[in-house]
């Protein structure tokens, strides 16, 4: 598989917690309360998806990656252990509100929907949405107009889905970005829209998707 030069949307990544964002004073109170809650129970429960290179498992079935390592370091600073829970990305706000998880730490895009529903850190990573097609077809697709007749696979609830729906393209929503790549590799979909960070780690020579 290969990237095309058609960048769909520029984005930023963030970590999120607590849905109380009414005012700055309220946010400070909520933050203190949330920290005490986490410290009292001794664990920071982190909501993630399998999203290499941000969050993924090694051969020992341990969660590693840029975000996973940051979450572990943050939990250590609080004097607690980090516990990782795979979530349905569509349900991240519901999981937070129900206290099934304490935070979301998964290369999350700072959208109006996200920042209105939960308190977020400042963005610490620039990202983009990119189109992935079979490498033998990449030269055919270099602008938006060339993509309009393709069928896309995107992660449900992701920035990729927002981008493709905004363009009016035909698409199928799947449960994860890795599933979107599988759709393209199997020929079920013509292209996938995923994060540039994931695409850089998951496709090309030496990966599971070299072609």
Across the structure, where does each feature detected by a protein language model lie?
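Bacterial lipoprotein signal-peptidase II cleavage site
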Residues: 11-27
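Extracytoplasmic small-molecule ligand-binding "clamshell" domains
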Residues: 26-107
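Alpha-to-beta junction loops
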Residues: 45, 79-81, 98-106, 150, ...
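Ligand-binding cleft/hinge of the Venus flytrap
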Residues: 56-60, 71-80, 144, 157-177, ...
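Short helix-initiation/N-cap motifs at beta->coil->alpha
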Residues: 84-95, 139, 156-157, 172-186
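A ligand-binding cleft/hinge motif common to bilobed small-molecule-binding domains
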Residues: 108-116, 163-166, 190-211
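Short Pro/Gly-enriched coil loops immediately N-terminal to beta-strands
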Residues: 118-131, 147-148, 176
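Flexible hinge/capping segments at coil-to-helix
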Residues: 133-151
